Curated annotation (Swiss-Prot):
IMP binds at residues 13-16, 38-41, 127, 141, 222, 237, 301. This is Adenylosuccinate synthetase. It catalyses: IMP + L-aspartate + GTP = N(6)-(1,2-dicarboxyethyl)-AMP + GDP + phosphate + 2 H(+). NCBIfam families: PRK01117.1 (NF002223), purA (TIGR00184). Binds 1 Mg(2+) ion per subunit. The active site is at 13 (proton acceptor), 41 (proton donor). PANTHER family: ADENYLOSUCCINATE SYNTHETASE. The lineage of its organism: Bacteria, Fusobacteriati, Fusobacteriota, Fusobacteriia, Fusobacteriales. InterPro entries: Adenylosuccin_syn_GTP-bd, Adenylosuccin_syn_Lys_AS, Adenylosuccinate_synth_dom1, Adenylosuccinate_synth_dom2, Adenylosuccinate_synth_dom3, Adenylosuccinate_synthetase, P-loop_NTPase. Belongs to the adenylosuccinate synthetase family. It comes from the Bacteria.
């Protein structure tokens, strides 16, 4: 069997979509195992840019694309995305949805907006797309699953009960107008007609493929440092975008996972609130942002930029049991002069070579850097590792040494062809 997992090692936006698109050329199945439409994945094919939110990044390839049990699905977003890529010539008949996946409802989106607007609450920086409230209902056992949509009577009963409870909150606590049951029910009946043929039990399908030694690529959204358990809590997402999240989010045994592929940007970025030890503020940080085009694929929000944090990198490598590292956007570092990588933190006079749990401690952390010589050459057309500038290779080799994990691919540009394959994944 061949189960490959691709995870982000930082705070997202590492370029997972591009790498998954490349790897999915030989994959029989590509499986999303967590998250929802709260993150954008950019895939560039022959200079043409595709921005995906909910669909697996491998949708542009021939392999079956699975939206797994651990994903939360907004049917409207799903159908809009299907329609958008079909209009550009892509086929989507190979996309299926787990009958165990939970459904994002209008009251989830409304609740998300309310929670982020309350003055006394910590501002997490949510995308306000209902992801967190949908996962909250899932854990509270109030959620509506895709399987419920296949039984209209059951869906009606669950929606009516949920909406009664949510409207109590909207009207009596927040003084808002109640949501209309009939409007929502009719809207979702329309969605059901368009997606019901895609709703299946994906667990036996994925496991059968693994048992038949087919290549199954598991795709995480967000990244390690946004994990609900291991990220910079509470500035995290509501699911587990780690290798361990595959077992619960896709329904496969950890024994069926052969490779853990960590995607790491050559510097570090973060969107929204939360601690960021290596953040570069001011003109130089803005320069990296401009060169790297560091703006959200979906929201357009500017990303905070900083030096490569290998305390975070080691943490991600260890927890995910990574077998391969993919370095992206190293071309952005060309011409920046001296480069820095963070190898430890100093907090209240104590040196940490790991990520502490306490967010307030991270806010006080001082990065301990190693400084390396940079390079000025344009590397975007280089195809062989040995053709990279000497200082670029030294940078990569030092990263590999600190992580104690081999770098297998180096991305030198946004197009799927702009990759240097050091060793086969």
């Amino acid at each position: 069997m061949a189960g490959y997992v691709v995870v982000g090692t930082q705070w997202g936006d590492e370029g997972k979509g591009k790498i998954i698109d490349v790897l999915s050329e030989k994959a029989d199945y590509v499986v999303r195992f967590q998250g929802g439409n709260n993150a954008g994945h950019t895939v560039v094919v022959n200079g043409e840019k595709f921005i995906l939110q909910l669909l697996p990044s491998g949708v542009l390839q021939a392999g079956t694309c699975v939206i797994g049990p651990g994903v939360v699905v907004d049917p409207k977003v799903f159908l809009d995305e299907i329609d958008r890529i079909e209009k550009r010539g892509a086929k989507t008949d190979h996309v299926i949805i787990s009958d165990r996946a939970h459904v994002i409802m209008p009251y989830h989106i409304e609740m998300d907006k309310i929670r982020e607007s309350v003055e006394d609450r910590i501002k997490i920086g949510t995308t306000k797309k209902g992801i967190g409230p949908c996962y909250a209902d899932k854990i509270a056992r109030d959620g509506i699953r895709m399987s419920d949509l296949l039984d209209l009577k059951q869906f009606e009963e669950k929606l009516r009960a949920n909406l009664k409870e949510k409207n109590e909150i909207f009207t009596k606590i927040y003084g808002l107008e109640p949501l209309d049951f009939d409007k929502i029910f009719e809207e979702y009946k329309g969605y059901i007609e368009k997606i019901k043929h895609r709703i299946v039990d994906t667990i036996p399908i994925v496991n059968k493929a693994l048992d038949e030694n087919k290549l199954v690529l598991f795709e995480g959204a967000q990244a390690m440092m946004l994990d609900i358990n291991y990220g910079t809590y509470p500035y995290v997402t509501s699911s587990s975008p780690t290798l361990g999240g595959v077992t619960t989010g896709a329904g496969v045994s950890p024994r069926k996972i052969n490779k853990g592929i960590g995607v790491m940007k050559a510097y570090t970025t973060r969107v929204g609130e939360g601690p960021f030890v290596t953040e570069i503020k001011g003109e130089f940080g803005d320069k990296i942002k401009g060169i790297g085009g560091e703006y959200g694929a979906v929201t357009g929000r500017p990303r905070r930029c900083g030096w490569l944090d290998l305390v975070v990198g080691r943490y991600a490598t260890e927890i995910n049991g990574l077998t391969d590292i993919v370095i992206t956007k190293i071309d952005v570092l060309s011409g920046l002069g001296k480069l820095k990588i963070c190898t430890a933190y100093e907090i209240d006079g104590k040196v940490y070579d790991y990520v502490p749990a306490d967010t307030k401690s991270l806010d006080k952390a001082i990065p301990i850097y190693e400084e390396l010589d940079g390079w000025d050459e344009d590397i975007t057309q280089i195809k062989k590792y040995e053709d990279l500038p000497v200082n670029c290779r030294k940078y990569l080799e030092r990263v590999q040494e600190i992580l104690a994990c081999p770098i297998s691919v180096v991305s030198v540009g946004p197009d799927r062809s702009q990759n240097i394959h050091i060793r086969e994944i």
